[in-house]
Every structure is written in C-alpha cells, then in structure tokens.
Amino acid sequence: MSNYSNAKEKFDVIVVGGGHAGCEAAIATAKLGLSTALFTLNLDRIAWQPCNPAVGGPAKSQLVHEVDALGGVIGRLADSTALQKRILNASRGPAVWALRAQTDKRQYSIEMLQMLQETPNLSLREAMVTDLEIKSSPNRKKIKEQSEEKTIGQVQGIKTYFGSIYLAKAVILTTGTFLKGKIWIGNQSMDAGRAGEQAATGLTEALQKLGFETSRLKTGTPPRVDRRTIDLGSLEEQKSDAADRFFSFDPERWKSGQQMSCYMTRTTQKTHQLIKNNLHLTPIYGGFINSKGPRYCPSIEDKIVRFSDKESHQIFLEPEGRNTPEIYIQGLSTGLPEGMQLQLLRTLPGLKNCVMLRPAYAVEYDYLPATQLLASLETKKIEGLFSAGQLNGTTGYEEAAAQGLVAGLNAARYVNNQDAIIFPREESYIGTMIDDLIKKDLREPYRVLTSRSEYRLILRGDNADRRLTPLGYKVGLVNDYQWNIFQIKQSNMEKEKKRLEQQRIKDSDPIALKIEKESGASIKGSITLANLLRRPGMHMNNLIRHKLANNSLPLDVREGVEIDIKYSGYLKRQNLQIEQIKKQNKRALPSEVNYTNIKTLSQEAREKLNATQPKTFGEASQLPGVSKADLSALLIWLKIQNRKSHAAKIRNNEAKIKLHSNLGVDF
C-alpha cells in the first residue's frame, strides 16, 4: 500500500457527485460529525434539475416525506422553491395520494448550495474524480449482512483527473448520468453528462478493474420553449390546488410563494405523422444506441409506436422558474434531429409560433447494477465504498435523494464501526426501493411506484414521520427541534383520537338529524364520533362544520386522525401481516442444508442458499436471487421438515416404550 505522503487532504468521508443523492449523503455524514468533502464537476450546478423541475408525484412524494422524516433536505427545498403544487390521485384512497410540486430549478440549486456551504464539517471541491485508492486487504467483515461475495479490498480515498489524491475512510459514489455520458440529438452525439457539462471519464474503468460489472442506460429530456411565444389563452389552464400542502413536517417551513399555472395541450395527427415519417432519424429507432430507457417516462416516439391506437397524447407546459421564460414541454421527450424538433413543436395547439430555446436530447451513461450492493448501499467487493442514486440504475431526484441519505448514514456508521441501518421493505418506500434494487436484476431505469409495495396503506406520506422519525432521532439525523415537533404532533393526534372514540351523539340530539341526512344512515340510540367518521362520505370537515371537531388543530393532525380512524380495520390487518413477517424473519434455519434437494426452489435460489447457508429466514429473504415464491417454498419445506421431525420423535418415543415394555421396565 502506498504511504500517500503526497495526499492533498484527508477526510472521514468523500462524496463523489453533487446531485440530489450526493447532497443528501454529504449533509447526512457531516451532520453526524464526520469531516466530509463533496466533489463535483461544477459547483454552479449543485442539485441541478436537468429534466423536469418538479418534486413528488405517486410514490415519489412518499419518498420525499420519508427523507424529511429522517432529517433530509429535499422536501424542505421543494417547499421553499415551489411554483405550483397539486394533489394527484385525490379521488382515490390515502395510500396513493401524492403531492407534486413544480419547482424553480435555479432557486433550488442556489438554496442547496447555500445549505451545503453552511453545514459544519462539510467542504466542497470542484474536480473530476477518475480513480479510487484501494487497500488490497479488507480491514473487517461486513456487519450483520449476508453476502456470498468476498471483499477484495478497502477504500482509502480518491484520485482526480489532474493527479491529486484525497484520503478518506469511506467514499460514496453518486455520479448520476456522468460516467462516460453521451448525449444524442438525432444521429449526432457528443460526450457530456448532460447538455453543457462534460462527461466523467476514468471512474468506470477503475470500477471494472476492481471486478465490478457496469452497463449502460439512457434517459432523455424534452425541448424548452419561450413562454412569450406560446398562445396560452388557447390552452387549458391548470392552477395550483395544494398551496397549503407541504413535504416537510416542520410547520416553520410551511410558507408558499405566489403560485404559477401550468397549461395542457395535445398531440395532433400532424404530430404523429411527422414522427412516423422520421423514426429512422432518432437514436433508438435508427439503431444508434440500444441502451434501455425509463419505462414510465417514454419518448413521444415510443408512445406513438406502442400506443398506435391512440389519436392524441397529453402534453403539459410547465414553468422552469419565476425569473425565466423557459417552459418545460412535459411528455414530448424526443430523439428527433434538432432541425425537426421545432417543426414537431409547432404541430401542437398553442405552439404554432413558438420559439425553441433548448432542444430535446437523449443521454446514455454507465451505471453499476445494484445487485453488487448490500442493503446498506455498501459495495460487496470493497469495504467502505458506497453507491447511491442514478449510478445504481434508478431514475428520479426523489429516488436519488433517498438513496443518498441511506448511503450517507451507513457510511458514517461504517467509519464509526457501528452496525449498518437496514430499511425493511415493509416499513418504508426507501426499504422497498433498496430491496428491489439489490435483489432484482434490473436492466432498465428503476422508478418507485405505489404498486411495488405490498404495504402501501401503511406506507403513506402523512405517517412517514411516525414510521421513521424515531429512528432518525436515535441515529442522530433528526435534531431536538425536529423531535419536539414530532412529539407535539403525535400527542395532538392521540388526544383527538381518544376524544372521538369517547364522545357520543344521541339520536335525540338536534344535530343528529342533520348528520343523518349527510351520511345517509340513521343513528340508532347513540354513536361515537369515531364510528360516525368511519361512515362512507363522512370526513373531519363534516364534524368541524357541526362543531364536533377541533378546527384549530393543524391540517396534518386532522387528516392523520381521520385516516387512522377511517381505515383502522385495514391498518390493523396490514400491521398484523408485518408482525407475522418479522416473526418469520427470526425463524432459525437448519445448518448445513443441501438446498439442491429442495426442488420447489428456483435454480438461482438453490445456488445462493447453498453458498451462504443463512442462519435465519430473514437472512435468506435478503439474498439477491431469492424471490418471494422461493421464500414461500422455503416456508412450506420448513413446515414439512418440522412435521417429519415431530413424527420421528413420536416414533422414537413409541419405540423406546415398546423396548422397555419388552424388558419389563417401568417408567
């Protein structure tokens, strides 16, 4: 090992990349008292939003609430820079309610940079990291995590393009789309991590030399148009409907600026025909690139090819900031040549005279398949090396921020020689996402979805603090101020729920007749306010209107109380399921099992189980390649083995009794 006498500086943790994952990771480690350096290619593009300047949406908003509950910052910045807020899926149940904020991308970046600069223990450096410094012999074993791969080394630091070495006890890679990034417009390409910014070189080769598998993914972004050249009056306006809703649980941050409208237009037959006639000129259909793009954010070419029966597709026009005329054309990501993109835009109603400020482009980049990571987001091969964000194959600022926080927390615990914190999938969307990433061989950008969780009624945004803030406080990410806010809210909720469960109204009360008309059901004798609230169509607002509920309670308290009461039966059943899973996770597995003989297991599961010989069912469930079907088969096998063992004991006892009886021995 080199003595590193020429090292420029030494830190506890180095974070490589200044996007949403990197910022959360760096703030987390610094907050936990570790000297931290964040390296990025461009300090003027910290936490940049190169695609849609928006935060939240289905499942994504739940992630943002969870990050905030753990002391992260994405929710606070989304609230303070929001241009417009809307509640999605409002007509459906609370499990899928989603807050979405259109944000001011420049202001977001400015505020994040300021936050980083004001964070104690955190230093910022502008440089391209091209290599990793590795000690060949690992220092210690992985803590409380199962891995069939042996570590081959321990991270010591990083090396920059111009040869400077910086030492660190842990390194977190959050490189986004920059590793060997290449942007495409039509059949033309250039090396870039995103438009106007250079690609990162060297680090992919460094990872490959260490034995890591890397592959390629792609994403894309639509054109930007000058607002002043759009006929907004002819378009459908979408106003904010949730200015009083927030991602953060801190009431001191519940402030909204003046809201801006978005607008909606649609593709036309001219749009579709132009695309069909020129598919061969796009990077994908022209065969210039073959990397997988995000399934849930397809290009307009993909939409028209895959949904050829649809006559039109919605296109949303969204502002990029208060002080810029740039409009983001959501739904029109395209790989068409630049000269053809303006023609495409002008086929849309309201945009026939528009001016295009920035063309759409696709970006292709290297990523690290996350099956090479532990649930702590530490790599299996190299101790102290963590990976988070788009580098792990995800797409979205929210997914990146959540991973960054987890990687930062566990990097700090690694440095302090503490056990890693693992987020079970049944307790958070963070856990669901990481569980999916490390266990599934994903070959397309991963987006979090409510449908990916079996426990979505419990994993709501409104109760993210209840689920995660105690953990955040315990590990040091949540400060005393945030903890006090949490305790006050929970106390208010419990008091109000208790009151509603106890207070009754009688059928003879004057208010009863009005309530019967509202709820469509009669009151016989008397009813508690809680049972009244459980009736379809009855809400806290109904109780407030009749002065039966406390209107002075904050909105989040009132909504949380209503959800807890209204869905108490469902919540109880789902909590019971989770407890059963936890109980099963502690169940011991026999030692030295030949899993090859269990034919109901998949071939991959047999190989992984044989290689690791997990001690508990919970350890088996954490292994990549062991599916839910395999786990069910393993449980059935365990039950059969227990029955056989029990039957064998009975036969053995009967044989002993018979033997002693023949010998004339009394018991």
From Swiss-Prot:
Task: Enumerate the cofactors the protein uses.
Answer: FAD
A GO MF label: flavin adenine dinucleotide binding
The protein's UniProt keywords, in alphabetical order, are:
Cytoplasm, FAD, Flavoprotein, NAD, tRNA processing
Q: How far does the signal peptide extend, from start to end residue?
A: none
Q: What GO terms fall under cellular component here?
A: cytoplasm
Family (UniProt): Belongs to the MnmG family.
State the function annotated in the UniProt record. NAD-binding protein involved in the addition of a carboxymethylaminomethyl (cmnm) group at the wobble position (U34) of certain tRNAs, forming tRNA-cmnm(5)s(2)U34.
| Name assigned to this protein | tRNA uridine 5-carboxymethylaminomethyl modification enzyme MnmG
Species for this entry: Prochlorococcus marinus (strain SARG / CCMP1375 / SS120)
